[in-house]
């Protein structure tokens, strides 16, 4: 049974993606900091027939993240799809003149370095199988910097650069790497089917080869 690991799993997009992939026969590894909330999500997914387990980890702590992914692989099977979508702290959304080096480093640890640790944990199994997908979820500051959102304007482009390089190197190995850019909060986008439309787009990125970056909506239509 294929397995998707959703890093940054929450009751919104993470749960929607879990349901979407669960309908396709995936087991779901839910990873975030709050074990209690993960347990609630596991119960809700079980009620609709989706197999899932929750693993608490802070993406800024490499040992925690690597341990969570290792336990998921041991209990559910090799990770075939990795979704990296932790929601940045509002501390990272400071104006540029308030940005400190320490906060910038933390934002980079949260986004770019966390992704690198996660990829290095799951990639060997994907390479051995010559199959898999890695999907990044980012806001609009991954494409265009905004002075009012300095942390993500620094960290998201670094995460994006790493992802794009992976896309170019791994496409010949049967591993798809893509980024979905969501400019603004999902409720404000007024999608016909709401968050389920976003989950459908992520499923499409998993199943179809293509360019690295996909914009959910044109950047100028979003907030961030």
Label the model's feature ranges.
Residues 172-224:
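C-terminal helical subdomain
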Residues 110-128:
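Amphipathic alpha-helical dimer-interface segment in Rossmann-like NAD(P)H-dependent oxidoreductases
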Residues 10-11:
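Conserved glycine-rich cofactor-binding loop
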Residues 78-79, 126-139, 174-175:
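Active-site loop of short-chain dehydrogenase/reductase
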Residues 67-74, 94-98, 102-109:
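Active-site Tyr-X3-Lys motif and surrounding loop/helix of classical short-chain dehydrogenase/reductase
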Residues 25-39:
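Conserved glycine-rich Rossmann-like NAD(P)H-binding loop of the short-chain dehydrogenase/reductase
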Residues 88, 101-103, 107, 111-114, ...:
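Catalytic loop of short-chain dehydrogenase/reductase
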Residues 45-63:
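Rossmann-fold cofactor-recognition segment
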């Amino acid at each position: 049974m294929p397995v998707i690991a959703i890093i940054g799993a929450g009751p919104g997009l993470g749960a929607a993606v879990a349901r979407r992939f669960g309908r396709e026969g995936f087991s779901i590894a839910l990873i975030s900091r709050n074990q209690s909330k993960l347990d609630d999500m596991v119960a809700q997914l079980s009620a609709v027939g989706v197999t899932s387990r929750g693993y608490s980890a802070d993406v800024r702590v490499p040992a925690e993240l690597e341990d969570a992914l290792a336990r998921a692989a041991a209990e559910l099977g090799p990770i075939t799809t990795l979704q990296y979508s932790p929601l940045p702290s509002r501390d990272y959304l400071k104006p540029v003149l308030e940005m400190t080096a320490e906060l910038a480093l933390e934002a980079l640890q949260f986004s770019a370095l966390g992704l690198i640790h996660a990829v290095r944990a799951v990639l060997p199994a994907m390479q051995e199988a010559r199959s898999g997908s890695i999907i990044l979820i980012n806001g609009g500051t991954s494409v265009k910097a905004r002075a009012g959102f300095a942390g993500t304007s620094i960290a998201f482009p670094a995460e994006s650069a790493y992802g794009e390089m992976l896309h170019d190197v791994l496409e010949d190995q049967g591993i798809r790497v893509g980024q979905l850019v969501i400019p603004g909060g999902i409720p404000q986008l007024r999608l016909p089917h709401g968050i389920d439309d976003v989950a459908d787009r992520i499923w499409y990125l998993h199943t179809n080869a293509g360019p690295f970056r996909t914009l959910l909506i044109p950047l100028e239509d979003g907030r961030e």
